[in-house]
């Protein structure tokens, strides 16, 4: 026991022996500077305790070991009621936020879907005026595509709830009254699901690489059909799939459980896309993506096609990722923080000028976010709300 305490003490203050990283996001805790005042008023002591909780040596080792014991021996879910992960049938894991949206089915406020669709329509028109292709890609929710793997109480919705029209359905209906190039990947996944190939991994919350590749192919088709995108290169077709061990986002929910070994679903092979030979093209494409975490796998899918160019991804309009596609690999620079909201930074960002493609990507559960306000801000910046000569100079 003394050896264990010594290791914990050394790990806390010296960083040796090294700890293991934990999955998930935690709020950073800092300790105030020790002064007579902070000592006497208790501020220092109050801050040290949460700091020790986060920085205790071998904390990660202890948490993973406790979670492994509780899961393996006692069949208890790690994290208890506070966890964001839900255990489903046959080793499938789900993120609670997506299950909650499925069971509550929140809708837009009156006329909200129509207003968002109108903003997207105006944004597409403005993009076309500048020779830029535009499309909206609505990513599906795993809980909506594979409800049969949810825990039994959540598999079938009560008739009254199932009859409700949620925000995603409202927006799709509103967009059908416009000319907006919209790829409804929810509907596409339900169609492709009948082919018998998994489109989501059991251990992850995002679409797998095979599903993302097919979604990209559908979105690229919608982009190339636009008059401003005739020169876009043809991407290699998805010829099939092969099974491989899950990697990266295939197991992002497994990583959140903080176990030493993956759950059974996290060890199951997942489909990976097989592409036809890439058509020869010297075109270098500049793509701007705005959206949520489903776009990361789309960028991976783009890199597999052999396309050359650059991708600027504005993640939730708060962080800017710049990716260079060389035709054989992708090179990603360190992300740039855009602030708490970042609308002004994104709207006036020089990387938007001269892009060939603007792609808005969001999961269906974020439909009511209205693109995090960016479509409306881009339209306002380019339509004379304020000084169009300044605000619209770098905006579509």
Task: Kindly give the residue locations of the regions a language model identified.
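Extracellular glycan-modifying ectodomains
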Residues: 1-396
